[in-house]
């Protein structure tokens, strides 16, 4: 009995010892829980680079906004391409204005803002580009062709008109009032280069045109910068002798009317003598320099008793008035 009791006691102690070895202590339980939390935290950190892991916490609109932001490099490339396209379109506009200015000068037409927009700017082009395109075209004309665009302001001849004429709304000068401000090309080359035959275009029509123009301007200049129609017509008829038309292939009256429309002459009705009076126009004063007029008069009126000092003084006054009005 005593042996059995001993054995039973031994078994109880063994089971108790086994139970003590298997059952974890409180400190072990806490350590195991902390280790488990640490493992889960590390797994979350490893998966944080994947956008899909945040699906439950990120709204669908937020993911859409993130996708719409696009690649910064792609946006920069698109921006550069757009700037390059704008630069190309700008240069095309500049070249169009340069071509139009040269063609207008060749055909003796004035250059107006309205015509530039209609003929040099494609449909749909912003009018806000006009000033910058015009300035760049002027710069390229100077660098490549030796010309610059000069503003011309229509002369105000009301001070020279008779009182009865001022009361009439329609005048010959009013027909060109739409050209109260326009541009023409003027050479920036030195005078010796302008006279160089190698740089002068050999054109019979241009030579005849400018010859007739300079003759008319010179005659008006030596007549104290104004002359009546009958006196000017008589002078031109003597030069043309038996010819019925001028070098412009028009009769005298129509030729003078053409020069008025082109801005080289101003024409005012004189009720006192019932005829037109011609003045040197703003365009002629702008394009024909004082030195150019003096050279022409000296060459083609060598035997005349013209007072060149008085002539140049009057013409210089007209030139200065035009220069100041153009600058304004």
Curated annotation (Swiss-Prot):
Polar residues: bias regions: 1-19
Chain positions covered by the region annotation Disordered: 1-80
Species in which this protein is naturally found: Schizosaccharomyces pombe (strain 972 / ATCC 24843)
Annotated Acidic residues bias: 31-54
UniProtKB keywords: DNA damage, DNA recombination, DNA repair, Meiosis, Nucleus, Ubl conjugation
Name of the protein described by the UniProt record: Non-structural maintenance of chromosome element 3
Gene: nse3
A GO cellular-component term linked to this record: nucleus
Keyword DNA repair applies: yes
């Amino acid at each position: 009995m005593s042996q059995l009791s001993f054995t039973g006691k031994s078994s109880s102690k063994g089971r108790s010892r086994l139970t003590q070895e298997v059952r974890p202590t409180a400190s072990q339980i806490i350590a195991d829980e902390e280790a488990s939390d640490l493992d889960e935290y590390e797994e979350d950190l490893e998966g944080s680079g994947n956008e899909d892991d945040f699906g439950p916490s990120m709204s669908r609109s937020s993911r859409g906004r993130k996708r719409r932001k696009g690649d910064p490099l792609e946006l920069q490339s698109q921006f550069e391409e757009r700037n390059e396209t704008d630069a190309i379109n700008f240069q095309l506009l500049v070249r169009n204005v340069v071509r139009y200015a040269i063609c207008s000068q060749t055909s003796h037409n004035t250059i107006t803002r309205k015509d530039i927009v209609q003929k040099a700017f494609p449909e749909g082009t912003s009018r806000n580009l006009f000033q910058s395109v015009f300035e760049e075209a002027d710069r390229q004309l100077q660098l490549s062709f030796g010309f610059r665009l000069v503003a011309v302001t229509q002369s105000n001849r009301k001070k020279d008109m008779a009182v009865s004429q001022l009361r009439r709304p329609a005048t010959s000068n009013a027909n060109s009032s739409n050209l109260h401000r326009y541009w023409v090309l003027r050479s920036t080359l030195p005078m010796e280069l302008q006279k160089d035959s190698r740089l002068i275009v050999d054109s019979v029509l241009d030579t005849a045109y400018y010859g007739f123009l300079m003759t008319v301007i010179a005659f008006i200049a030596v007549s104290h910068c104004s002359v009546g129609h009958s006196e000017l017509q008589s002078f031109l008829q003597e030069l043309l002798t038996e010819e019925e038309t001028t070098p412009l292939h028009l009769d005298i009256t129509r030729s003078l009317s053409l020069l008025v429309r082109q801005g080289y002459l101003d024409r005012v009705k004189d009720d006192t003598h019932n005829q037109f009076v011609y003045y040197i126009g703003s365009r002629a004063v702008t394009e024909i320099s004082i030195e150019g007029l003096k050279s022409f008069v000296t060459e083609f009126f060598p035997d005349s008793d013209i007072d060149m000092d008085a002539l140049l003084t009057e013409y210089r006054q007209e030139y200065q008035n035009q220069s100041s009005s153009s600058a304004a």
